[in-house]
């Protein structure tokens, strides 16, 4: 049996949303087929539906960090944008991922080094919230197999959100 679920900052206990600023998360990701840890953001108003993926790792390839920007569903002419960083095994030790979100600019960092950025008017300008989760199975990561060590844990050592509302 596998139990998993997201932790997000848009819950009934206390909504933490922001428009522009920095989110930094210290993580240790699990390795193994079928495991899919992610740090991502969604809009408070689910109608517009842009999505910012700060970190995604497929467990069978922990040496590849994926970052994505999915524009609004209402903008059919805007393709998804993504970047894959290879060479650092994220299942080995702790790593810090960070997103700096400014008007018309998104910048991704891994362990203090800038790894990707996007600019343009499609950068969200509405309140968003943070989601931390470990998905198991599904089409994208595939099912766990005999090589997957369970239980598996997506460890979060800390989350820091700095709001930076423009003047």
Kindly give the residue locations of the regions a language model identified.
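GH16 jelly-roll
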Residues: 1-167
């Amino acid at each position: 049996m596998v139990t998993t679920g997201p932790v997000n900052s848009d819950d009934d206990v206390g909504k933490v949303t922001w428009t522009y600023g920095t989110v930094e998360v210290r993580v240790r990701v699990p390795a193994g087929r079928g495991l899919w840890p992610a740090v991502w953001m969604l809009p408070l108003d689910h109608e517009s539906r842009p999505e910012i993926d700060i970190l995604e790792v497929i467990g069978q390839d922990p040496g590849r960090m994926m970052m994505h920007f999915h524009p609004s569903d209402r903008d059919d002419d805007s393709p998804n944008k993504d970047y894959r960083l290879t060479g650092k095994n994220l299942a080995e030790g702790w790593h810090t991922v960070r997103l700096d979100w400014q008007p018309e600019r998104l910048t991704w960092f891994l362990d203090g080094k800038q790894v990707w950025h996007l600019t343009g008017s499609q950068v969200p300008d509405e309140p968003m919230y943070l989601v931390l989760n470990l998905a198991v199975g599904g089409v994208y990561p595939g099912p766990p197999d005999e090589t997957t060590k369970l239980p598996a844990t997506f460890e979060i050592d800390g989350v820091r959100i700095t709001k930076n509302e423009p003047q």
